[in-house]
UniProtKB/Swiss-Prot annotation:
A ubiquinone binds at H201. Heme 1 (or BL or b562) is low-potential and absorbs at about 562 nm, and heme 2 (or BH or b566) is high-potential and absorbs at about 566 nm. Coiled coil: none annotated. This is Cytochrome b. Heme b b562 binds at H83, H182. GO terms for cellular component: mitochondrial inner membrane; respiratory chain complex III. PROSITE patterns: CYTB_CTER (PS51003), CYTB_NTER (PS51002). The cytochrome bc1 complex contains 11 subunits: 3 respiratory subunits (MT-CYB, CYC1 and UQCRFS1), 2 core proteins (UQCRC1 and UQCRC2) and 6 low-molecular weight proteins (UQCRH/QCR6, UQCRB/QCR7, UQCRQ/QCR8, UQCR10/QCR9, UQCR11/QCR10 and a cleavage product of UQCRFS1). This cytochrome bc1 complex then forms a dimer. SUPFAM superfamilies: a domain/subunit of cytochrome bc1 complex (Ubiquinol-cytochrome c reductase), Transmembrane di-heme cytochromes. It comes from Giraffa camelopardalis.
Length: 379
């Protein structure tokens, strides 16, 4: 008699994706982040659902409803901080996941990679809308500044901004629609994740060496389920350390002041995970140029398969490309630091140099270095 997990219409799907899935025998801990992102998404949806039960998307009561959640709702404080810091963990895992894809050449799975980039944009949109909901000072001014960037689009820019705001400034209509979008987008992310996995399972996973692994596959369960559980425990440990010891470490103190349209904070900045893109935006003196650079800083990932000139897929045996990759990581950390600094003398020029370096490494240095290494193989 055939095993029920292999014959039942629903269990068969789960079995083929999580139990009997043939996986390469040599994938490292860098392959853990996919499952960690799934855990983060489920955690965010669950905590967000409970927060939405008590939150009111209205300019007069939004700030006090968040205070009410933290003070009066049973375990409301832990749900709120798990949701806020869970977003940070989500982005840490996302950046690691994308970095792994770049390092090991996973972008050669075109459909999986392109859906992944769409997922990244969707998660960033969701996280941006979340920033507006507590209706603190940084919520209001962050939303005003970032949405106002769309006015740089020729002809339709101003109309587009007013259409998104639902008026002539960020107000009740903006808050209500951002709450609605913030609620629905995670479910769209979940659907896109299913498509992402569907395309991945068409080709099978990549591996650190970047070579076909069809001749040496092992079942996903128990080998990688155990490995993923270990990763999940470490993720939850770090998250709970953040939540229980330093819940406001990654937030902005200005958001503990209710939104006031008449008082602008001295330094308007987004959440830490957007600072690298914000630094690229600020490094260009022209508004439209800045917006284009901001979009391109993420959209550039779509072009990675076209920029791949190496005969080898992975960077494992390409030392020069490895050096460039880690310089790129250092550059992104520099941009993140600059994004949080005021716009004054040393930071402006550092930001501009780091922005030039970012695009130079990806568009010029990496493809050229890969081509040079191809010639070195002939020696």
């Amino acid at each position: 008699m055939i095993n029920i997990r292999k014959s039942h219409p629903l269990m068969k799907i789960v079995n083929n994706a999580l139990i009997d899935l043939p996986a390469p025998s040599n994938i490292s801990s860098w392959w853990n982040f996919g499952s960690l992102l799934g855990i983060c998404l489920i955690l965010q949806i669950l905590t967000g659902l409970f927060l939405a039960m008590h939150y009111t998307p209205d300019t007069t009561t939004a700030f006090s409803s968040v205070t009410h959640i933290c003070r009066d709702v049973n375990y409301g404080w832990i749900i709120r901080y798990m949701h806020a810091n869970g977003a940070s963990m989500f982005f840490i895992c996302l950046f690691m996941h994308v970095g792994r894809g770049l390092y090991y050449g996973s972008y050669t799975f075109l459909e999986t990679w392109n859906i992944g980039v769409i997922l990244l944009f969707t998660v960033m949109a969701t996280a941006f809308m979340e920033y507006v909901l507590p209706w603190g000072q940084m919520s209001f001014w962050g939303a005003t500044v970032i949405t106002n960037l769309l006015s740089a689009i020729p002809y339709i820019g101003t109309n587009l901004v007013e259409w998104i705001w639902g008026g002539f400034s960020v107000d009740k209509a903006t808050l209500t629609r951002f709450f609605a979008f913030h609620f629905i987008l995670p479910f769209i992310i979940m659907a896109l994740t299913m498509v992402h996995l569907l395309f991945l399972h068409e080709t099978g996973s990549n591996n650190p060496m970047g070579i076909p692994s069809d001749m040496d596959k092992i079942p996903f369960h128990p080998y990688y389920t155990i490995k993923d559980i270990l990763g999940a425990l470490l993720l939850i440990l770090v998250l709970m350390l953040l939540v229980l010891f330093t819940p406001d470490l990654l937030g902005d103190p200005d958001n503990y002041t209710p939104a006031n349209p008449l008082n602008t904070p001295p330094h308007i900045k987004p959440e830490w995970y957007f600072l690298f893109a914000y630094a690229i935006l600020r490094s260009i003196p022209n508004k439209l140029g800045g917006v284009l650079a901001l979009v391109l800083s993420i959209l550039i990932l779509i072009f990675m398969p076209l920029l791949h000139t190496s005969k080898q897929r992975s960077m494992m045996f390409r030392p020069f490309s490895q050096c460039l990759f880690w310089i790129l990581v250092a550059d992104l950390l520099t941009l993140t630091w600059i994004g949080g600094q005021p716009v004054e003398h040393p930071f402006i020029i550092i930001g501009q140099l780091a922005s030039i370096m970012y695009f130079l490494i990806i568009l010029v240095l990496m493809p050229v270095t890969s081509a040079i290494q191809n010639n070195l193989l002939k020696w």
